[in-house]
Amino acid sequence: MEISQFNPAQIDEVARMAASVWGKEQGAHGAEVARVFCGHLSRYSLYSSELALQAVDEDGLQTITFAWMPGDTNDADVWVRNQFTTLSEEERNTLLTNENYLKRIDAEILAKMVPNSAKLSFFISRKKGYGTPVLNALIERLRSRGVEWLYLWTDCTCNWQYYVNHGYEKIGEGVAPEFSTDKEDYTYYMFWKRIL
């Protein structure tokens, strides 16, 4: 396994990785919605290639982790709206609901962030044992910038227990009514960890 800085030209491959996890849910809305959702999620999470790392081995790209600092921006909103031309109104509304969810929870965690902090915005790994070394390398990069706290949010579609098991403290949780059903709440969780 080789850990290196992520090349933004590979963002479509990251979207395909995301589709293997989150695309299944979106697939209920159609293959094109799943493709656009995962493409948007990947682009929405990438702010700075300097705070984006990857693990590659003989089988290709295996792990990705992105972070952002308060004030960072990207053009994910423009990208997703450029995809709307081929979608129905219902499909566009599905994607806008997802975008609003991402922005709402990001705003919620941003309100909790203290000075000298960053947010882990994306973390996915295909191979067991690859994720933690890549995340640790990103944390080292953040430490070199003087970042003291790492924040993140995740939800019930992810392995949120990973963070509990790796020393992150839960600082909040909530229910997303737009994705909840009568039988099950769609829960999201917020964590932080002192890294410096």
Regions found by a protein language model. Give the residues of each.
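Conserved acetyl-CoA-binding loop-helix of GNAT-fold acetyltransferases
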Residues: 127-141
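Conserved acyl-donor/pantetheine-binding loop and adjacent beta-alpha core of acyl/acetyltransferases
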Residues: 71-122, 126, 179-183
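Conserved active-site alpha-helix within GNAT-family acetyltransferase domains
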Residues: 132, 144, 156-174
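Conserved GNAT acetyl-CoA-binding A-motif
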Residues: 117-118, 142-155
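Conserved beta-strand-loop-alpha-helix junction that forms the acyl-donor binding cleft
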Residues: 121-127, 151-161, 178
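Active-site rim helix/loop that mediates acceptor-substrate recognition in acyltransferases
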Residues: 29-58, 62, 66
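A short beta-loop-alpha structural element at the N-terminal edge
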Residues: 1-16, 27
